[in-house]
A protein has these predicted regions:
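Membrane-embedded alpha-helical segments of inner-membrane proteins
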Residues: 9-178
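Short, small-residue-biased leader/transition segments that mark boundaries at the very start
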Residues: 1-8
Length: 180
């Protein structure tokens, strides 16, 4: 005779099996592989932009005076970015949102072309929404911000050329956002 615990285990496993009922996985197409590789690359970009936000807006008075001395090649660029802090913040926010939305679209394309969820709407939601949100938060926000908060000046000096480029690239959007 089986115990009550075995009955509960069987019921739990049946519910878990029902969650995966009708789910099929197919080999990813070349387009799907490119999409997921681009998404991973953009996840690094998201982390870079998020880290830049913390680094540029967390510089200490000592860091700022060191930047004013201009000992490093990026110091003038950092000063120029900080002198237009509203536009800097607008550029960072626009860049981060653009990258994150693109990551979500690429991952949706990848999952839609490789995993067919059938009637498993809950599993589809869990995989695409919860897992993707977790990855974006962990690798695109939290970890990069922790690193840059501990290395503000060093990170700003490395990030200044790329952020200056983004400032120019998103200039029409950031300027219109500031003047709203």
């Amino acid at each position: 005779s089986r115990g009550l615990g075995d009955v509960y285990k069987r019921q739990y496993l049946c519910r878990l099996a029902d969650l995966f009922d009708g789910v099929t996985v197919t080999a990813p197409t070349m387009g799907a592989i490119i999409a997921i590789l681009l998404a991973v690359l953009l996840l690094y970009a998201s982390g870079f932009v998020s880290a830049s936000e913390i680094a540029f807006f967390s510089l200490s008075p000592v860091d700022l005076s060191e930047i004013e001395e201009g000992k490093h090649t990026s110091d003038r660029r950092i000063s120029a970015l900080l002198n237009d802090s509203e536009r800097l913040l607008a550029t960072i926010l626009i860049s981060n949102n653009f990258v994150n939305v693109t990551i979500i679209m690429l991952c949706n394309y990848f999952f839609a072309s490789t995993i067919h969820f059938g009637n498993s709407v809950i599993l589809e939601f869990l995989l695409i929404t919860v897992v993707l949100t977790f990855l974006l938060l962990l690798f695109g926000e939290i970890m990069p911000k922790i690193y840059s908060a501990q290395n503000t000046l060093k990170f700003c000096r490395k990030a200044a050329p790329a952020i200056s480029f983004l400032k120019k690239f998103f200039s029409p959007l950031s300027l219109s956002l500031i003047h709203i």
